[in-house]
Amino acid sequence: REGVRVAAARCSSSAFGARAVPWPVRSERPMSASYLKAAAARSAALPDDPLKAFASYFTECHVMSTEFAATGRGMAAQRAVAAGDLLLSIPLEHCWTAEAARLCPELAPLGDAVLDAISPENLIALHILIVRARGAAGDGDRCRALHAELLAATHVETLLNWSEQELEMLAGSKWALAPSWMRQDLEQEFDEWCHYAPLVEVFNAHRIDAAAFVWAHQVLMSRMISFALADGSTLHVVGPGVDMFNHSIDAPVGNEDVRLEPPASASVPDAERQLVVRASKAYAAGEQAFFSYSCASNGRLLLSGGFVIPGNPWDSVELALTLPLLESVTPLYAALAQALDGGLESGGAFAEFVPSEFLQPVPNESGPPTAVVLHVRLAYATIAEQLARVVPFFEAEMLARAAPEARDLSPDSLGQPANRRVAAQRLVACVLELRSTYAGSLEADEAALKALEAQGAPSSARRQQALQVLIGEKRILDTAVVPVDVCPLACMPA
């Protein structure tokens, strides 16, 4: 459907969160005292209601920016609204998009060949930096210029702000490593651009260096929304005002709250689509309005938005299980993949929408793939169902090794209790291996978090966030490695 939101980011260094994550605190659930103190300090320099600056650019606006005791700054309904009512609407022409960046006077002269070689996310990042440096260039940029000023005055918090020592507090989790990889990729990309003279002129004229480029991508990580369009393309948008809404895990995950809509007036060209926020439920006047940034784990929220949610129901751990791709088992893998959330990934360097489970062939430069990676975003609420879909892959690989010349392997070949038990044991061993990379017990982390929360020191905010991530991930892994002799997976029927 036109305008369906993409709920996860590309698996590349240049596109990190795909849902808007506004500042400074973003969860409907109350945050720790230390985190709220730090957030209050970061927002002290902002205007009382930064939304007012954009009033003339909104098609409709029925919210106002307000401070809330439980969450910090958020968006309050100006009047009572019903579920589905419009809260905010802004034309795309006033938003940050790759199309707007290509029309930027500093970037347009580079020509289509060069601009086509720059990713949409990088185009938006460069546009933000250019406008931040020089202000508006014509009426089309005035709204974006105001937004760039606000972005420059706002502390952008992501895991890229954490020091190497602070990231070590996440040891065991992939989120301890991802920020360094991302920063390295961004800096390398910027360095490569510095060998292209026309871009160097743009950089020098607008004081753009590697640090600024990383900052702009942090803005995208925390504020960008992506929409899957009917033609198969993806539209990335940073919408002034839309990025001021807070996240709620109680808001429904879907495409009805933040969406692309045609203009309400027939006199307005259809090309001027609107970025719209609609109420996911009824709100009273003055009540904070939220939408869901998607079913993101605390690790992903911390990476892209600098916050976590205590007891986040969407917490997950990402498994990457490599299996040999023997000729006899290839059709069986493909058949089993149909039961996965995302099926079989075919071609391309990344998935535009990253499902919770999918099978991906490992590229082989010298010929056909010889291995596959089974990606599983293991969530606490669905552990049993997900592992039940994974065990048959291990069983299939066992059968293929035992009979490499077999040509009749099918789902009907699976389900023998003894084979299923061994396959479950192998899966549990993989999970245990991942669990062993985490230091300490779940109980020790819970006790440490409780002690830090009691102290309420702002200086411990990041330590508390790290513990929330580790607690969520350890709880999932500890649940997934119950003894095989009592594990229902070992005795599952075919």
Model-derived segments and their meaning:
Residues 2-8:
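Extreme N-terminal basic, low-complexity initiation segments
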